[in-house]
Every structure is written in C-alpha cells, then in structure tokens.
Amino acid sequence: MVDDNLGGPTHQHFFNARLHMDIDGGGNTVTEHEFVPRPWGRDNPHGNVFDTTSRVLSRERDAARVANGETGRYWKIANPNLTNSVGGAPGYKLVVNPSPLMLAQEGSFVRSRGGFATKHVWVTAFDPAEKYASGDYPNVHAGGDGLPRYAAQNRPIENTDIVVWHSFGHTHVCKPEDFPVMPVEYAGFMLKPVGFFSANAGFDVPVDRNARSVRSAHTPPAAPAGDTCCHKG
C-alpha cells in the first residue's frame, strides 16, 4: 500500500546496454573472473589465502552469464594481441550489480519477449543487423527474438569483433514514500580500466587550488569580508 485504499503492484524495470567493445583496436576477448578461497594446506597454513580464477568465454552459448555477488564475479574485455607496461593484455572490466533477473515464469509473454533480461551478461559476435537486445519488434514477435536468438548461433567470440550486452534494472516494491511523486532510484554498472593505462590516469588532471589552504609555516592570507569556512564576518 502507498496510501489509503491505494496499492502499487510490485514490478521490475529492465535496461540493456549494448557495448560494442573495441579495446585498443580489433580483436577482443572476454574473460570471467571470480574470487575463490583457497583450502587449508601447506600453501595456506593460516587459512586466509584466496585466489582469483579466470576463464575465457570462447563461444556465444558459454557467454550468457549471471552475476554472483558472493564471488565478486566480473568480466574483463581485453585485446590479447597487445601487451601493456607489465606484460598483460590491456583491457577494461565490467562490474555489475547482481540485481534480480526476470522473475516472470517460463512461457509467459513477458519472459518470452524480454528474454534478454534472463542473464546479466551476454557476449555475441558483432553483426550490424543485431541492434536490439529484445529484437526489432518486441511487442509483436512470438517470443525468443533478440539476444536468445543471437546467442543460439553459438558463433566464436574469442579474439574477434564482439558486442558485450549487459542487462540490469530495478525490482520495485512500492512504498508510501513513492507517492504521489516517486524519488530517484539508481541502477547502473561500471567499466573500469584494467591494465589499460601504465599508471593512474588521473595524475595529469590539474588540481583545484584553494586560496585558503596554505602550509602551516606560511602566513595565511587575509580573510575576505563575509563568512568563510574558518572565520565569521
């Protein structure tokens, strides 16, 4: 309920970002990474060691993936044909929010027409005709179009021209604070450089100078008239 005699149905909002990746030129590969605790043993005598796993997504059917917050699962898009300053492949990683996927049942019109929302990540070979995650006409097709159909071709996606698709959204349980005008809800993802730069890319960004911030050994400048952070006018 959001008000007297007024209810709001629980529902889902979904978006899909079509990311035609081109990291340092053509020929990109996607790898999936997770954090895994190492079992007790001679190489983990104190039980505090954990490892990162990596596996290549080589074909489209293998690349329809679901996020896992327990293992911090993320995906790296890299150019295996080049090396960075430390000998690795330059790339970016896709960090997603493991939010609920499509909750409608198998066979429902919503699920069959919005099949893209059954996975958090898809990777397909680039095809200029494959523009939309739900197909060209989602309101009228019988179901199965879009990403489920694209991925069913099972094309190779290793070291080639690829598209990374990310489905994300918000599962909304209505509350009184949403009425009569709903406040902002946030949904999104991050693309972060991983081995793409040789150092922190923010080092050459000019810093703002605050005239009131001075070294303690220096005489501070006279405060201007009016209130400041440290003086009352």
Range-by-range predicted roles:
Residues 1-233:
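Extended effector regions of multi-domain proteins
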